[in-house]
Swiss-Prot record:
Function: May play a role in genome packaging through direct interaction with viral DNA. Binds to ssDNA and dsDNA with the same apparent affinity in vitro.
Localization per record: Virion
Organism for this UniProt entry: African swine fever virus (isolate Tick/South Africa/Pretoriuskop Pr4/1996)
Coiled coil stretches, renumbered: none
This protein's name: Structural DNA-binding protein p10
Length: 78
């Protein structure tokens, strides 16, 4: 009797572990979760749009401003 119970409990443990791990092969690819762009509050696109609407130039001496530079300018113009 005790041997049967013992094998049962170990078998149950194994199956629960296995199913949770191998049951979802796509679990840790990051595709199921929201894309990283969703996590950053303001996207570069949004920054450019705000800058345009406020009349802040996006380009400076031939190169495009970085997100942080745009952010600074937008904050200053507020």
């Amino acid at each position: 009797m005790p041997t049967k119970a013992g094998t049962k409990s170990t078998a149950n443990k194994k199956t629960t572990k296995g199913s949770s791990k191998s049951g979802s092969p796509r679990g840790h690819t990051g595709k199921t979760h929201a894309p990283p762009s969703m996590h950053s509050g303001m996207l570069y696109k949004d920054m450019v749009n705000i800058a345009r609407s406020k009349g802040i130039p996006i380009y400076q001496n031939g190169t495009r401003l970085t997100k942080s530079e745009l952010e600074k300018k937008i904050r200053r113009s507020k």
